[in-house]
């Protein structure tokens, strides 16, 4: 069995299966029925969370333990949250089929609906590029881009109409997302996409992240494996997870190139 060149830390999976506890862990009670889902810390130290049960977005102050909720509208289902450098939250809402911006200070909200041709898109994941544009995916077979400066939302069908899952931007500005048994490369100029099949046996690529030299890491939630693709030489490598029953979903690569 080959060892991972970077630590793969299935921390929360391990905790849920063993009952172990984190040293110094702290719990924050929320309003009854909040049903928190997506979570995103912002640069100012607050934590945004999707209160799926209340059709709202919450903001928690970990220092005081106080939280407030911002109503997103009837039928809202916040699926993913990204925080920008100013501390604002950008919410992918699958129920409203829209992206919402919630201000980090005054908590005012602004809605950017998706074009009618992408209804419902099944909004899934999002990431900012270096130009401040928000790239996003939809599980119903779409990828798109929101340019806040132009207030423009563009959407394109994913290759073969398959679900578009996790999305990332490499250090050199390339946009990639996971699509079950493939990775998809998006042209940042016109939104066109090229599908790159993963090795045979890959079942369900979900999370994706890029390291400091542009290699792509992806989790296979159907095969309990971690994959790495190097665009520089088109090479693939994969490693089995310690638990063959694991179903890895989200994936992040931190500033030290550690895969979580």
Stretches with model-predicted labels:
Residues 28-32, 71-74, 113-118, 157-160, ...:
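Surface loop/turn motifs at the tips and blade-to-blade linkers of beta-strand repeat domains
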Residues 41-44, 83-86, 128-131, 169-172, ...:
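Residue-level detector of Asp-centered blade-edge/turn motifs that repeat once per structural unit
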Residues 35, 77, 95, 121-122, ...:
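Beta-rich catalytic cores
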Residues 61-65, 103-107, 147-151, 187-191, ...:
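Short loop/turn segments that connect beta-strands within beta-propeller blades
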Residues 48-53, 89-96, 134-140, 175-181, ...:
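Conserved beta-strand positions in repeat-built beta-propeller and related beta-rich domains
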Residues 28-55:
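Beta-strand-rich domains and repeat architectures in extracellular enzymes and scaffolds
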